Regions:
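Outer-membrane beta-barrel transmembrane domain signature of Gram-negative proteins
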Residues: 19-42, 127-142, 201-316
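Flexible loop and strand-edge segments within Gram-negative outer membrane beta-barrel domains
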Residues: 15-55, 59-63, 74-147, 157-164, ...
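Outer-membrane beta-barrel proteins, especially TonB-dependent receptors
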Residues: 3-14, 62-64, 75-77, 82-83, ...
C-alpha cells in the first residue's frame, strides 16, 4: 500500500474500499444466556409412592448476526429436557411393583459452517482484507479468500443434532415367606430406545469483490465490482445417524436366609437380552440360565458356586450354547480373632 492508501485505512473515510474490520468483535457478543427450570413432585402413602423430576435447560451461544434472516436463527444453542419418574406400589403385603422411567430430549444447533472452520477463518482473515458488506449490501470478499466469516454465521443456514432417549424398566417382586422364610421371586422387564438425528437447512451465499480505481496520486476515482460464488436457495435434509434399541427380561427365584453363624444365598436366574441397531449385522441376542449358591460361615469363610448355561446369536448355529461352571473360595482374615484388635491390619 502507498502512504495515501494507508491514510485511507487510518481515517476510515472509505471503509468499503479500505476496511479495518475487527472480525472477532463482529462475530462474538459479550454474553451468553442460560435458562433452566426444575420441578420435583413426590408423595404417596404406605401403599403407593411416587417421585417425578422435570428439568428444562436452554443455553445460547456467543455469536452475533444470527437473526438477519426470518427463515432461521443460527445462534449456537443447547436445549435439553429430562423427565424422570419412579413409582413404588405395594400391591399386597408381600407383592411390590416398581416402575422407573427416564425420557431425555436434547437438541444442539449451530451455523452450517463447521465451528472449527469458522474459528479458523476469524483468526486467518486480516482486518484489511475486505469489508463485512459492500456498498450494494453484498457480502464482501476477494478472490484470494472466497469466503466471509460473518456470512458463514448469518447466511449458511443451520445444522441441528437431535437426540431422543427413553429408558424404562418394571420390576415385580413376590415374597414367598409363606412357603419358607427367605424365599422370593422377582421379574424385571426393561426397554431402552436411543436415536440420533441430523436436521440440516443449508445454502450457499455469494460475495462481491470491490477493487479501488486510483489516479496517479492515489486519489480514489471509483471502483470495480466482481461477483464471487453463486447463492443458492435454502435446502433441507434430514438423516437418522444412529438408532439403538435394547430389551431385556430378567427373572429369578431366590433364597436368602441366615441361621446363626450360617448364611445361605441361592438364586436360579433366567436372563434374556436383545440389542438392535441401524445398519447391517448389528443385532445381538443373548440368553442365559444359571444357578448361584453362596455359603458364608461366621463372616469369615465363604464358598460361591455358579453353573451358567448361556448362548448368543453371534455364534454359529450348533455352537451357540454352552455350560460355564465356576467356583470360588474366600477367607476374610481380618475377621479372625487373632486379627480383630490388630492396630496394623484391619
Amino acid at each position: 500500500y502507498s502512504p495515501r492508501e494507508l491514510e485511507y485505512f487510518r481515517d476510515g473515510t472509505n471503509p468499503e474500499l479500505y476496511p479495518n474490520v475487527d472480525w472477532q468483535n463482529m462475530a462474538y457478543r459479550d454474553y451468553a444466556m442460560k435458562h433452566q427450570v426444575d420441578f420435583q413432585f413426590k408423595g404417596g402413602s404406605d401403599r403407593f409412592k411416587y417421585y417425578t423430576t422435570v428439568t428444562y435447560a436452554n443455553v445460547s451461544g456467543l455469536l452475533n448476526h444470527t437473526d438477519m434472516f426470518s427463515l432461521y436463527n443460527s445462534q449456537l444453542s443447547n436445549v435439553q429436557m429430562n423427565v424422570r419418574t419412579n413409582f413404588d406400589v405395594k400391591v399386597t403385603k408381600s407383592t411390590i411393583l416398581k416402575l422407573n422411567l427416564l425420557v431425555r430430549l436434547k437438541e444442539q444447533k449451530r451455523p452450517a459452517t463447521a465451528p472449527s472452520t469458522l474459528v479458523q477463518r476469524l483468526f486467518d482473515t486480516p482486518s484489511a482484507a475486505f469489508p463485512v458488506q459492500t456498498g450494494t449490501g453484498a457480502w464482501g470478499s476477494t478472490s484470494v479468500y472466497n469466503y466471509n466469516p460473518i456470512a458463514d454465521i448469518a447466511d449458511r443456514g443451520t445444522v441441528k443434532a437431535i437426540r431422543r432417549t427413553l429408558l424404562a424398566d418394571m420390576t415385580l417382586r413376590q415374597e414367598l415367606d409363606f412357603v419358607t422364610p427367605g424365599l422370593y421371586a422377582e421379574v424385571t422387564v426393561a426397554y431402552d430406545n436411543m436415536a440420533n438425528y441430523n436436521d440440516q437447512r443449508t445454502r450457499n451465499y455469494s460475495c462481491e469483490m470491490v477493487t479501488p480505481v486510483l489516479d496517479a496520486e492515489d486519489n480514489i476515482l471509483g471502483c470495480t465490482r466482481q461477483s464471487l460464488g453463486t447463492a443458492s436457495e435454502l435446502g433441507w435434509n434430514s438423516a437418522l445417524n444412529n438408532l439403538e434399541m435394547y430389551s431385556s427380561l430378567y427373572g429369578r427365584i431366590g433364597y436368602d436366609r441366615t441361621f446363626g453363624k450360617h448364611a445361605v444365598d441361592a438364586q436360579l436366574v433366567y436372563e434374556q437380552l436383545a440389542r438392535v441397531r441401524n445398519g447391517r449385522n448389528s443385532t445381538m441376542k443373548r440368553q442365559s440360565l444359571y444357578g448361584v449358591v453362596s455359603y458364608d460361615y461366621d463372616s469369615r469363610y465363604n464358598v460361591d458356586a455358579v453353573v451358567n448355561w448361556s448362548g448368543t446369536a453371534v455364534l454359529a448355529k450348533g455352537s451357540r450354547f454352552n455350560v460355564y461352571p465356576a467356583i470360588g473360595l474366600g477367607w476374610t482374615v481380618s475377621n479372625e480373632s487373632f486379627l480383630k484388635n490388630n492396630p496394623v491390619i484391619t
